[in-house]
Amino acid sequence: IDLEEFQEIVEARAMFAFGHCVRRFGIDLNEALDIVRNHDESYLPPSEIEKRKALVSALDNLVDFATAEETQMYMDMEEQNEDDDPERIFYLYNNIYATTENRDIDYASSIAVWWVNLPEETTLMYMTQGDERVRDSHRALEGLSFPKSSFPEWLIPPIDWRCRCYLVESFTRPNYMDIQDIDSLIGNAVNPIFKRSLAKGGPIFGEDHPYFTVDKRFIQPMKTISSNIKSKYNIV
């Protein structure tokens, strides 16, 4: 495959995904890219610095994610038999997988937008939707609260695919010190792919995502493509 052509495909997917993110911030794509490119934060209030941190992290992560995703799709197509229909793989990645991924990008970004505008002393409580679709492991975390300043990254939704949990302000004292064996709750509930959070400047999709496990021969071309795209937006 031609690397320049492949890079264009990757960048188109990354920008589409980033578009899902920036609309949650109430800005358009061009404005978001200007914010990412501008490294001078000296004139920004704290909430705007957090906002920029989230946008930079999102674009950085989504470029890597799109590079890995398109590479995985190419690998799957390579493994096909001649009689197999490539449209099946296109549909799988560009419709089935992408729909779930875009939904999680939207949700992680919505949480981040809300987060950056909260004072550090706010107490935040983890909540579920309270219906039959809630996973038992997520229900076990309901009501757990921390100050924003020390809120664990792993507890910021989404913490798994299609997670609908959310955070609310609590006006009682944080209760995390009252909870026994928090480590086991984490292990049961949190998908490692989501152990970091955009709200704290982490990636949307973590390094544990299977897309990032690729054939060794693709690693260097992937790094080159990702770096080329990021350099356009002053991400180093």
Indicate where each model-derived feature is located:
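Domain-core detector
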Residues: 1-160, 168-236
